[in-house]
Design a protein with these regions (language model features):
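Extracellular/periplasmic carbohydrate-active domains that bind, remodel
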Residues: 1-370
Length: 370
């Protein structure tokens, strides 16, 4: 069954709030058995923060052809950490080739969380909580106020042919952030934003990232980990056939300098191209962005990490950096056929190792310090 938001009173003028209409149409589709399509035709639809909650009786596909636009007025979204949220939905599909415009420039100056611990979080553009067996495809997210996409407590989700865009200096605009979720695929997509292209927090398991172009941004990151007690492990990440262009980091694992105990293991990074990337390969167990962290050794154990066929150019002299914990050294780190060059003023490309155990095979440029 097709549910056209225009027939329920949606106004595609870019100024009228359509959140009640969208809520009503989703509820109708959700309570209908079989396959149901929510159609959002061409046009620009202003939308206040909305939660679309299951479980649903049948399958729901949100087919977005037009543009959804967030509110500019922050007084109406203060302390609301989402814009569009899907919860407890199974077999959800988002498709259509449309666009989500978070209107980030109206709020980025208010993003003070990196400096102010009492800050009010800005809205994440698209949140998925407890969503299963779902696909997000052929969509564009631009200028999120905070992260573009957040995936929490989800299972068996596929993101493909997604375009994520924000300026490189936009604060905290992570592309896709994953936590407490398993069997998540991110395929055939382009992410160009102001923070991590993809980031994984505790409880991320069996994550597959393939054929993704990242840049600008901060790279693909695991962490920061160890920030709280009883964190779930990160287990099973595969990143293949990806390209990084001008990013602040490439493949990064980071843990807090003085952390609680947890583990990160079974990570594989293969067939990666670096184009003028700072820190192409980095493990940082002294992570402290505020420079005001408690001193001590990280208690996060990093092991079974494989890097294979990583090639291209580094914008930093140190192209491979393993700064592991003295208390919990990195174990079973494997480097296979690394070819990274540096053409800056600091001299020959180099690697740096601290508290790491592993093996290097095949070509190694820079020369391996393992």
């Amino acid at each position: 069954m097709v549910f056209n938001v225009m027939k329920d009173g949606a106004v595609a003028d870019g100024n009228t709030d359509n959140s009640k209409v969208f809520q009503n149409v989703f509820n109708k589709a959700c309570q209908s058995e079989g396959r149901n399509l929510v159609l959002i035709p061409r046009g620009t639809y202003m939308l206040a923060p909305i939660v679309l909650k299951g479980p649903c009786k049948g399958q729901v596909e949100f087919h977005i052809i037009g543009t959804l636009k967030a509110l500019i007025d922050e007084t109406s979204t203060v302390d609301i950490n989402h814009w569009i949220t899907f919860q407890y939905v199974d077999r959800l599909v988002l498709s259509g080739g449309g666009k989500l415009d978070g209107q980030g420039p109206s709020a980025w100056d208010d993003n003070t969380c990196s400096k102010n611990p009492n800050c009010k979080a800005l809205p994440i553009s698209l949140r998925f909580d407890f969503v299963t067996n779902s696909r997000i495809t052929q969509l564009t997210s631009i200028n999120s106020k905070n992260a573009h996409v957040n995936v929490f407590a989800c299972k068996d989700m596929k993101f493909d042919h997604i375009h994520i865009i924000a300026p490189k200096d936009s604060p905290n605009t992570d592309g896709i952030h994953i936590g407490s979720s398993s069997n998540i695929q991110i395929l055939d997509s382009t992410i160009a934003t102001g923070d991590d292209c993809v980031s994984m927090s505790p409880g991320s398991k069996n994550i597959n990232i393939r054929n993704v172009t990242c840049g600008p941004g901060h790279g693909i990151s695991v962490g920061s980990l160890g920030g709280g007690p009883n964190e779930e492990d990160v287990n099973g990440l595969t990143v293949t056939n990806c390209t990084f262009i001008g990013t602040q980091n490439g493949l990064r694992v980071k843990t807090w300098a003085r952390s609680y105990a947890s583990s990160v293991f079974n990570l594989t990074f293969e067939d990666i191209i670096m184009d003028n990337v700072n820190n192409p390969i980095i493990i940082d167990q002294q992570y402290c962005p505020s420079r005001n962290c408690e001193k001590g050794d990280s208690q996060v154990q990093i092991r079974d990490v494989k890097y294979g066929n990583i090639r291209g150019t580094s914008s930093s002299k140190i192209a491979v950096a393993f700064d592991c914990s003295k208390g919990k050294p990195c174990e079973k780190i494997e480097l296979n056929n690394i070819n990274l060059t540096y053409h800056g003023a600091e001299g020959a490309v180099a690697s740096s190792c601290s508290n790491v155990k592993g093996i290097a095979n095949g070509q190694q440029q820079p020369g391996s310090c393992i």
